[in-house]
Amino acid sequence: MLLNVLRICIIVCLVNDGAGKHSEGRERTKTYSLNSRGYFRKERGARRSKILLVNTKGLDEPHIGHGDFGLVAELFDSTRTHTNRKEPDMNKVKLFSTVAHGNKSARRKAYNGSRRNIFSRRSFDKRNTEVTEKPGAKMFWNNFLVKMNGAPQNTSHGSKAQEIMKEACKTLPFTQNIVHENCDRMVIQNNLCFGKCISLHVPNQQDRRNTCSHCLPSKFTLNHLTLNCTGSKNVVKVVMMVEECTCEAHKSNFHQTAQFNMDTSTTLHH
């Protein structure tokens, strides 16, 4: 009998203790902090129903940069029961930066670096252009002084052999129309000589002759073309059919101009 009474008393005491602890647990909320190893540590005794923001300045994680960081977790409702409360999920914890000094310094360094690259490239290009422009400007200035002051007899002028020997005598195709009065017009395909050849003039010479070269036909044929006319007589035209052209040199007297005879009965059309 006494044993039964003792058992009942012990059960009543245990029930009272559990009810008190349970009511105490409802008023209290669990707070969590982050230790140096990155694990959550549960702390009791806080009166607020939310997860405290923990300063993680001392963390040595590789993904954490400069500045102070905080951890934000979901708020826990204080009306939940003890069995429904759960530990905060790490997937729902977000890491954010509260100080932007590191980002500002990085942006400032990138801006200064880009400015240095731009100015150094511009200065380098400017030096290169100055180096390439100096010889041309110097030659132009020397030629200007020679023309203004008069070149002395012993002055030597530099010239490139490639520019002197460069000739451009080309054979260009064109359409030639051969016409005559009271005759039908005839159209043929021919070539003409066009280009630049070398000419040499030496002053104060006794013979006063110039050595000139002209772009002339070097290979050609003479064709006799008969025109269809209304009269009883047929008209025959002799036309030079040009195949190749070259620069040919010849000597001429001073102030003598070359004379070119052109048949008025032929017209040129490119």
Swiss-Prot record:
Keyword set includes rRNA-binding: no
Coiled coil, from the record: none
Domain CTCK positions: 169-253
PROSITE patterns attached to this UniProt entry: CTCK_2
Glycosylation: residue positions: N103, N112, N154, N228
Listed Gene3D superfamilies: Cystine-knot cytokines
MF annotations from Gene Ontology: BMP binding; morphogen activity; nodal binding; Wnt-protein binding
Induction: By nodal/nr-1 signaling and wnt8 signaling including the downstream effectors mix-A/mix.1 and siamois acting synergistically with either lhx1/lim1 or otx2. Also by acvr1b/alk4.
Main localization (coarse): secreted
Note: Microinjection of cer1 into blastomeres results in the formation of ectopic heads that contain cyclopic eyes as well as duplicated internal organs such as liver and heart. The heart beats at a rhythm different to that of the primary heart. Based on this phenotype the name 'cerberus' was chosen after a mythological guardian dog with multiple heads.
Name by which UniProt lists this protein: Cerberus
Organism: Xenopus laevis (African clawed frog)
Source taxonomy: Eukaryota, Metazoa, Chordata, Craniata, Vertebrata
Gene: cer1
